[in-house]
Amino acid sequence: MTQHTHIATLHTNHGAIKLNLFGNEAPVTVANFVDLANGTKTGKPFYNGVIFHRIIDGFMIQGGDPTGTGRGGPGYDFNDEPHDDLHFHTPYKLAMANAGKKFDGSGTNGSQFFITVVPTEFLWGKHTVFGEVADDVSKKVVDAIAQVATDRDDRPNDDVEIVSVDIEAV
């Protein structure tokens, strides 16, 4: 059974999303997320003011790009951390967004992440699951965000902003 090592709370302009992070199963990914959220890697909290730039109702919400375009990141990449205990069998999984593998086989994870709203097992092995939505109130916030109006490129018509992120070790 997976035990969470941290709780991250994303304070958005649509409400708070509490996330359980699985640092034992995905230690590099969780450390990266925590360090970005706290500002340890960048000198200031990386996710504050960043938007969910891609929202697809019935699939997922994606954020973590400081440019808001889907092309930005922290300036470095790291490899996937697939784990047999972390799958997409159920909705509300937190995972790293990436651009697939580089020619040399290395990963393209950086700062972008997504939260699923349905089971998405076809993503396993392509994206590192490193957490899940922690409670029903947070799930309702995720569901509400997933249903905001978007343009044909899945960008919200009105910004869905991550105002701040709190991290708590457990």
Where are these regions (language model features)?
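Cyclophilin-like peptidyl-prolyl cis-trans isomerases
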Residues: 1-170
